[in-house]
Amino acid sequence: MAHYPTRLKTRKTYSWVGRPLLDRKLHYQTYREMCVKTEGCSTEIHIQIGQFVLIEGDDDENPYVAKLLELFEDDSDPPPKKRARVQWFVRFCEVPACKRHLLGRKPGAQEIFWYDYPACDSNINAETIIGLVRVIPLAPKDVVPTNLKNEKTLFVKLSWNEKKFRPLSSELFAELNKPQESAAKCQKPVRAKSKSAESPSWTPAEHVAKRIESRHSASKSRQTPTHPLTPRARKRLELGNLGNPQMSQQTSCASLDSPGRIKRKVAFSEITSPSKRSQPDKLQTLSPALKAPEKTRETGLSYTEDDKKASPEHRIILRTRIAASKTIDIREERTLTPISGGQRSSVVPSVILKPENIKKRDAKEAKAQNEATSTPHRIRRKSSVLTMNRIRQQLRFLGNSKSDQEEKEILPAAEISDSSSDEEEASTPPLPRRAPRTVSRNLRSSLKSSLHTLTKVPKKSLKPRTPRCAAPQIRSRSLAAQEPASVLEEARLRLHVSAVPESLPCREQEFQDIYNFVESKLLDHTGGCMYISGVPGTGKTATVHEVIRCLQQAAQANDVPPFQYIEVNGMKLTEPHQVYVQILQKLTGQKATANHAAELLAKQFCTRGSPQETTVLLVDELDLLWTHKQDIMYNLFDWPTHKEARLVVLAIANTMDLPERIMMNRVSSRLGLTRMCFQPYTYSQLQQILRSRLKHLKAFEDDAIQLVARKVAALSGDARRCLDICRRATEICEFSQQKPDSPGLVTIAHSMEAVDEMFSSSYITAIKNSSVLEQSFLRAILAEFRRSGLEEATFQQIYSQHVALCRMEGLPYPTMSETMAVCSHLGSCRLLLVEPSRNDLLLRVRLNVSQDDVLYALKDE
Amino acid sequence: MSSRKSKSNSLIHTECLSQVQRILRERFCRQSPHSNLFGVQVQYKHLSELLKRTALHGESNSVLIIGPRGSGKTMLINHALKELMEIEEVSENVLQVHLNGLLQINDKIALKEITRQLNLENVVGDKVFGSFAENLSFLLEALKKGDRTSSCPVIFILDEFDLFAHHKNQTLLYNLFDISQSAQTPIAVIGLTCRLDILELLEKRVKSRFSHRQIHLMNSFGFPQYVKIFKEQLSLPAEFPDKVFAEKWNENVQYLSEDRSVQEVLQKHFNISKNLRSLHMLLMLALNRVTASHPFMTAVDLMEASQLCSMDSKANIVHGLSVLEICLIIAMKHLNDIYEEEPFNFQMVYNEFQKFVQRKAHSVYNFEKPVVMKAFEHLQQLELIKPMERTSGNSQREYQLMKLLLDNTQIMNALQKYPNCPTDVRQWATSSLSWL
């Protein structure tokens, strides 16, 4: 793997390109493009929204990869900061070691994963961006090119959500492809121009060779924690730009015709990568986690002591992925000087940072920000989104051509500096690589303000990503679970309620309504409540989850402002007030008692604080949160009414009239009238759900599905029931099959049997299978009921009837004890309802079955 | 010489017999998973397939095993688990959690027990720390972390499942079923219960999450099978050390099962209850009568054991009462006849008794009132009479309303067998007007 020179001894200046797009609602100015200038060599990189960037982290050989979504200036605090919002990708080495096996194959050396983890903070300091990188999305069928020699290209095929690897969804795939294509379009004319400006002998292959050379040297370099972009980086960027249009052309046409796709890509990679990658290198990357602790100790020249002293808070800071601060910059410089003592000072392009430098840079930044003119405030309504997008595209195009022009002009300088730095790096001994990042990304949001003040470098390795130290986990199995072997097994897997479908059929309307509600609240930066009701198994929670998932994607694509999503479930609480504790913990990670948590939350939501992102709170099983004073419901629905809270509450319960039935007026008034009711599924909807799950799988006869759907629709309309019955039907089908390998089809008989098994009452069979004395006792009860005309009798009365019956049927005389045993036996099965037996003779007995059923069961002998 | 031979024979017998008794008692008292299953092959297959799918494929499931007491629910699940654990890939990959509704009487205790049995991180030694809320969120998080393919499947066995349904909000059941229906750690929830109306006990949300699989065990065998079970339960295993004795014993058992009187006993037992525990009880009593001098079970043993089993417990108590107490019971019986099951008090009973003593009887001593009161209270202690619930307050003891817990037929039957009963008392019992 290449060393990505991140912190060289030059410093970089970051400035915005283009006019800011001020958004009043968002309280910050957004930009389309950023320009990074490196001190000393007057090169510039232009980074645009939608491009893939490298971001410096604690592992310098594997800097973080992300897609730039938004550039903006955060001026909430006096020194305005350049911030960026990104969509992260993870490298395989960043995946926790214990989860790596989930991939189930060897990862490609340049494979990265779309990081689908909404809790991860995507808001970063723009000044940590190192440079550009190419990311090529692969369709699920594609093979990740393994022995590709072009290392500046990364491939994304799967997404990783901290739980499992999933193939990229088709929208995502298209989305990843799109920006490159558009960039290619923009750059096409420019490329032609730049090519003509270059010396004719420069073929792409040569470019690559040059770049690889630089990369080789870079791998030996000692990274220094300064932001500036080095000449090398500049060079790489330039090459990347040259390669880009060609590459994206390749991919775009490749995606049109799939059969030849892989071949072509491989061919291309061969052209661009003449040098072979060394095998040991790869091994090293695969096992950095193991070596990490010792290595950090080795590297930690001066800051190990600091680290030891660090308080827990500091440790949290340590784990965040941030640019090293200026103070550490200086110190690291100092520690490095002895190592790089053999360097030729004349070629060292780096400038050792001194306090004056920092000041100067700050001033420069401030100036740059002042220059940013404010555009008229826009209200970001849906209607205006389109126009805005058009404007953005225009701006991007303009910025692009301009930056390319600049690049062309400064090319020679870059070349010179490149070679010099190569030599310098060759002289430095190779240093052990740093520990891979094991950062908790969730924490970064709370640390915006501390970005520039912190004084530690992340060194702690192998920290769990969750903020909790003791991550509870069920032991993982030593042997992998078997995969479905037959069609029926596959069907069973898909029919399991837990199998998450790609889309929720038959709930499109409800989905749209909820989506619109939450989206409008997000766009308006207001709060609100919505009450969702419906009988169990109608897809309430699933629909809300789907909405949130879509909104999170939209937030990543920058269509809606980012938001925080919290979910609580009334049934998963031991006590209603625990809901405060859970919300607080999910919101801020704090732990507190219920009362304290309530205070903190009230403070957070009701006081005028710093602008925060909107919180979407899903309260499942709302009725469980009922208390006598109803203070919890009151609070939950009161917070959104505060202007500063920016809280959207989605409350789910079963009963439609819950607000009227159990809530006080002041609570139900705050809940408002935004209500939605999920109707039970009709039979055709259930049928559609089953069909969509069994798509392309011939396991069921159509009639069998229809029968199940009709039966369930008639009874409850519960989708879970429907799926469970079908699952059982596949089992019955499998049992009835004699030959295990014959492709059996679930017929109507099988589903009928499953339906009967699940819905039929067992009382009658129970009576039929009970002993003679039990049956005659039941007869005695019927006789006694008929005699007295009541539906209840004491044991004594029934006993006398029972004795008479036994005498008639020639059974031996039943003693009182025996009869009592019979009675309590029937009572324990709940065929009878009996009083506690301490009442003895006087205990009252009732039938729990209808008299007709008993008669039917007894007669049938 | 012959006497010595017989002596040594009897010695061998005592040894063998103690072994026989040990083996058989173990069989009767303990539900060992070694015993054979009968008549539940279909259910067994269903359950074991389900467990296998959870263990091998990581498919979550929930199932209820429903059947009356003594129908072999626990035996079925034990068998299935034993078979499951014999599969090599499974034995290390499956965690088991056993809960019992009678032990884990609320969710708090149940959660601690689950955490302890799963040996999660907050278990120190044998204790689980943290509050109820913490434990719940801890456990839920632990289970949420896993997924189908990589986590160890957990099998939850909830004995006396109906009692869990009475826990507050059914939190535990909701969460278990919710996990079984969502893509988390694969779990199998197996509930054992004897209540046929169990589904009505579940709250609607809990019910919706339950997969509605029910395995019914109904004791659906007939009398011939019952006799077969009897034989099977009583026969000695092939690996019994003394082969000769075992052969003889088994022959005897075969002979017994064909004996008419034995079959009558068994038929009677079968009529009362198909519960195998009651059969075990009968056999246990019969087994206790086997001694060195009487090494093989006979039909008489079984008949006497059966009599012991079907004894009326209250009649037995009546046999041990004093004459005065018997007289009081008879007085109460008459009161019941006169006032048609209305409750009575001590004073009424005393008056009735006085009438009998003064008019006719000379055999019964005219006891003083406190003595009679004492006898009355003794009857109450034996729970042959029971105070009415409402009037337990501050009324005087003499006037507290009571009810008799003996049936007329019971009293008459008991008097028949009562030793040394005075004739006039017996006469008085048959008719309250006998002194006229």
UniProtKB/Swiss-Prot annotation, chain A:
Keywords: Acetylation, ATP-binding, Disease variant, DNA replication, DNA-binding, Dwarfism, Magnesium, Metal-binding, Nucleotide-binding, Nucleus, Phosphoprotein. The modification Phosphoserine is found at residues 199, 252, 255, 273, 287, 340, 417, 420, 478. Phosphorylated during mitosis. Changing residue 620 to A: Abolished ATPase activity. It comes from the Eukaryota. The record marks 94 as: Histone H4K20me2 binding. Residues 501-861 are annotated as: Necessary and sufficient for ORC complex assembly. Its main location: nucleus. Residues 440-456 have a biased composition (Low complexity). The BAH domain mediates binding to dimethylated histone H4 'Lys-20' (H4K20me2), which is enriched at replication origins. This is Origin recognition complex subunit 1. It comes from Homo sapiens.
From Swiss-Prot, chain B:
Changing residue 73 to A/E: Impairs ORC complex formation. The keyword DNA-binding applies. It is found in: Nucleus. The keyword Mitochondrion does not apply. Keywords: ATP-binding, Disease variant, DNA replication, DNA-binding, Dwarfism, Methylation, Nucleotide-binding, Nucleus. Pfam families: AAA_16, ORC4_C. One of its GO terms (molecular function) is ATP binding. InterPro entries: AAA+_ATPase, AAA_16, ORC4, ORC4_C, P-loop_NTPase. The modification N6-methyllysine is found at residue 7. ATP binds at residues 67-74. One of its GO terms (biological process) is protein polymerization. One of its GO terms (cellular component) is nucleoplasm. Its main location: nucleus. Belongs to the ORC4 family. Component of ORC, a complex composed of at least 6 subunits: ORC1, ORC2, ORC3, ORC4, ORC5 and ORC6. ORC is regulated in a cell-cycle dependent manner. It is sequentially assembled at the exit from anaphase of mitosis and disassembled as cells enter S phase. Interacts with DBF4. Interacts with POLQ. Component of the origin recognition complex (ORC) that binds origins of replication. DNA-binding is ATP-dependent. The specific DNA sequences that define origins of replication have not been identified yet. ORC is required to assemble the pre-replication complex necessary to initiate DNA replication. Binds histone H3 and H4 trimethylation marks H3K9me3, H3K27me3 and H4K20me3. It is linked to Meier-Gorlin syndrome 2: A syndrome characterized by bilateral microtia, aplasia/hypoplasia of the patellae, and severe intrauterine and postnatal growth retardation with short stature and poor weight gain. Additional clinical findings include anomalies of cranial sutures, microcephaly, apparently low-set and simple ears, microstomia, full lips, highly arched or cleft palate, micrognathia, genitourinary tract anomalies, and various skeletal anomalies. This is Origin recognition complex subunit 4. It comes from Homo sapiens (Human).
